[in-house]
Structures are given as C-alpha cells and as structure tokens.
Amino acid sequence: AEQERIVACIQEAELVIENYAIKATALQKLQDSFPEALKKSILQEAVQGKLVPQDPSDEPAEALLERIRAEKQRLIKEGKIKKDKHESVIFRRDNSHYEKLDGVERCIDDETPFEIPENWCWVRFGTALVNRDAERIPLSVSQREKLDKKYDYYGASGVIDKVDRYLFDKPLLLVGEDGANLLLRSKPIAFIASGQYWVNNHAHVIDAVAGVDLRYIALFINATNLAPYVTGTAQPK
C-alpha cells in the first residue's frame, strides 16, 4: 500500500512538472517575442494616427499634397524628374475612397487597410514621393574588389561593401527589393541612407519633396505586411 501511494504521488508530481514545463516554455516564447510584437504594435498605432494626439490646427494633408504636386511639376519642367505616366488622384465620396486613374474612377475601399484621421488622406507612393531607381548602378563582386574602400555600397538589407565613388549625397529612403528579409523581417526593409554612397539594383531609392518626412515613410513600410504583394519562392521579390 505504501509503495502504491509513493507511485501515485510521483505520478502526480510528474504531471505537475510536465504542465509547469509546458507553461514555462510558453512563457519563454512570449518573453522572446514580446519586444518585437510591442514594436510592431507601436508602429501600427503610429501609421494609423493613434500614437499621438491629433492637433486640429495642423495643416491638412490635402495642403501638403498640393505643395508636393507643385514641387514635382517644377522639377519636371527643370528636367530633374520624369512625369508620372499614370497620375493617381484618391478622394473620399459617400464615406468611401475612390481613385481616379487614367480618367477612370473606381472604389478602392478594399485597398485601404485601416481608418485614418479626418485631415489625413490616402495617396499612392508615386504621388507623394520621387523614385530614383534609374540612377542605381550594380557593381559585381569582381568589380568592387578592384576599388578602394571609401564609400558605403548598399544592397537590399543595408551596407554590403565599400567602393571608391558615390552616386548619392543626400539622405534618401532605401527599400529592399528582394530577398528573404521581405518576409522574415530580421532587419528593417526600409531604412535611411545618408552621407555619400552607392546603391545597387536590389534596393529601391526614394526621394521626398515639399517636406515629406522619409522617416515616417520608412515607419509605414516597416509596419506594413508585404506578404500579399511578394512574388517568388526561392527569391522573394
């Protein structure tokens, strides 16, 4: 009888220990993932306009958008940028969002992932920003080996080498174009490059006009789930 009680007691203790181990493992996973989850949550609140109080005296987004259009028109006339082939205009009507593109209007409510403050507005990236991808020049490893190591050479996830010349000499937003990091997010896919540097064709180069803050654009991209837009399996793009 004593042996039976001992066996029963040990079995009960083993069950408690097993349950404790399961809960301890779950707690460790939560602790490991919490910092990154909290960061993503804060980013999401920020891009939705919920992180800081909205000041009604702030300039509405439409006014900024008008300045952006005027500045881009000036740059087009000066030959510094090319005119958008397909100009997009997004507006609200009847509590829905519509886009006018190539003279055709369509509802885009299914493309707006969340509600935004009343004085904000949705725009396509090409409307608010300037794409400078045409200025990128890729250099092979063998080409780079022959160059002095002076200026940063950027790829999809950041600096991957140094070269003896540069293409850009102002802060610009770089967005990784391909690679597993598009889904894994072990590093930010959007980041600011500064100083004098070179960029290969694995990172998009984005410039801003009329006071658009590229740091906010980087936050928005890094808070966005790109899985629905990624193509390719061996090499996501």
PLM regions and their residue ranges:
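Proline-centric
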Residues: 1-14, 18, 45-46, 114-123, ...
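Non-catalytic DNA-recognition/assembly elements of restriction-modification systems
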Residues: 4-7, 16-19, 23-26, 32-33, ...
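Hydrophobic alpha-helix feature that most strongly marks membrane-spanning transmembrane helices
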Residues: 11, 47, 130-133, 179, ...
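Extended, domain-scale alpha-helical bundle/helix-rich regions
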Residues: 31-32, 36-109
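Short, well-ordered loop/turn elements at secondary-structure boundaries
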Residues: 37-38, 47, 147-150, 168-170, ...
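Short, conserved phosphate-binding/catalytic loop or strand-edge motifs used
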Residues: 62, 236-237
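DNA target-recognition patches
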Residues: 97-106, 126-191
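A short beta-sheet element
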Residues: 155-159, 163-222, 226, 231-234
